[in-house]
Amino acid sequence: MLIVCRNSKSQDLDLYVKGVHFHLNKTLAKRSAKVTTLLESNKLHELRWIIRDMDINPSIFHLVTRFCYGYKIELSADNIVSVLCIAYYLEMSDDHSSNNLLNKAVTFLEQRVLMSWSETVKALCICSDKILDKLANVGLIEVFLDSLIEKALNDTRLLQDLITLPLRLYEPLILEVSKHNVSLENLVASVCNYANRWVFEKDSGDGSVSRNKREGIEAVERLLPHQRGTISSGFLFKSLKESIFLGACSDCRKGFEVRISNQLDMARAKDLQILSPTEDGSYDIELLKTILKSFYSNDSVPDLSRFVSVARMLEEFLLEAAASDAGLRVGTFKELAEIAVAASCDVLSYSDGIYRAIDVYLERHRDLIESEKMEACRFLHCKKLSPEACEHASKNEKLPLRIVMQVLFVSQMQIRDKVAREMKGVVERTENQVDEVESMSKKLLKLEIEPDYMKKRKIENLECVVHCEKKKTSVWREVKRKFGCMTSSTMDACSCHIKKRKTYHSYK
């Protein structure tokens, strides 16, 4: 901005704000204590530095000049922050004039802006760093933040709107909200959307943009919770990759690594694309080893299913790398296979996943010599192949001859073990059948003895006909009791006798 005094007596001014011309006279001094002081001390040139430091747009300065001349001005969420700042630094307050711009701006802020969530966010999201600095100096940043925090705690879904704010406002807002018992789902969603908007966008190559992105990814790591499963594994891997690319601090990178290792079993093979080859065709093997080491050394011992999930994921990643990367070198494939085998050892019953990856790799690299093929198959454990995989491998012409011979040997061993198990089963079934025959013989012998015993009872009790089953009440006895054939004395007896009754004939 350029200021030109027309003459020392009139003190009329010609101002240029970012190339836009403004003509002012002493009317401005009547509304601004600062300008009055500068005029009296003949230091009007300092006004240029005041306005430049606030990065005032010509439209805002035009609004101020209109107020100084007594015209009506239109305040809005778009201009209220800048108007507040310029009114404060030009000392357009009650101390200088009863009808002042600062009082008018503060009233509008309280009644029209802070009462509305959307208007408050809108007022802040368009502020430059210089304006925010001035706003912080006068203590108005806290006023805006307190208003937003109060509303966000009542409805955490509003956190999605905050991603439009500058980082210096967004981070303290999320940190303060996270101290309360709020929905982690909405909080995490807001942080992830912020990263997608400000960090993961394609870099234009500008140094300042890269610096802002680096600060952004470091803030994202600080804001994300550590609870297992609250953040998708895909986002964590993507954030880790971006933190490495942007050269973020070690604490930032370590934070993402820890979160990934805590829920590695929830990741998918495609999430491991962070290991995708760089320009030189190499994979970040050490990073993968670091994450796996952290996962397996976790103090909270996971159940076996988590180990199984990680082992299968690594096998699937190895398969995808073999299928999609035509430039995958033998040495790199071998290192990835070694990691996958180490993860599946004593966890998976079969190593069919490793075999499938090797088969695909050999298919895509037909030009490999025999020694290179053997190198690719170095960590293939033929003894852990399923019978189906052995059958396929025994006919696989892509495999080295030595591997095929090992597979054939394993197949023979599997057949022998199968026959042995079947023979053992036959012997066990035969023994069971013998036991059943002996049991049946004992039952038949018992049945042969029972008739003699029953005959003896019939001889002793000629008058009683007993038809009974073992451990069951005589049906005939029940019939007699119901029809009054049993006296109290005969009820106590172990068997009852049928008393002969006289037959009476009635003659008419």
UniProtKB/Swiss-Prot annotation:
<feature type="modified residue" description="Phosphotyrosine">
    <location>
        <position position="355"/>
    </location>
</feature>
<dbReference type="InterPro" id="IPR000210">
    <property type="entry name" value="BTB/POZ_dom"/>
</dbReference>
<comment type="similarity">
    <text>Belongs to the NPH3 family.</text>
</comment>
<dbReference type="InterPro" id="IPR027356">
    <property type="entry name" value="NPH3_dom"/>
</dbReference>
<dbReference type="InterPro" id="IPR011333">
    <property type="entry name" value="SKP1/BTB/POZ_sf"/>
</dbReference>
<keyword id="KW-0597">Phosphoprotein</keyword>
<dbReference type="GO" id="GO:0016567">
    <property type="term" value="P:protein ubiquitination"/>
</dbReference>
<comment type="function">
    <text>May act as a substrate-specific adapter of an E3 ubiquitin-protein ligase complex (CUL3-RBX1-BTB) which mediates the ubiquitination and subsequent proteasomal degradation of target proteins.</text>
</comment>
<dbReference type="Pfam" id="PF03000">
    <property type="entry name" value="NPH3"/>
</dbReference>
<protein>
    <recommendedName>
        <fullName>BTB/POZ domain-containing protein At3g03510</fullName>
    </recommendedName>
</protein>
<feature type="domain" description="NPH3">
    <location>
        <begin position="156"/>
        <end position="414"/>
    </location>
</feature>
<feature type="domain" description="BTB">
    <location>
        <begin position="11"/>
        <end position="77"/>
    </location>
</feature>
<dbReference type="Pfam" id="PF00651">
    <property type="entry name" value="BTB"/>
</dbReference>
<keyword id="KW-0833">Ubl conjugation pathway</keyword>
<dbReference type="InterPro" id="IPR043454">
    <property type="entry name" value="NPH3/RPT2-like"/>
</dbReference>
<comment type="pathway">
    <text>Protein modification; protein ubiquitination.</text>
</comment>
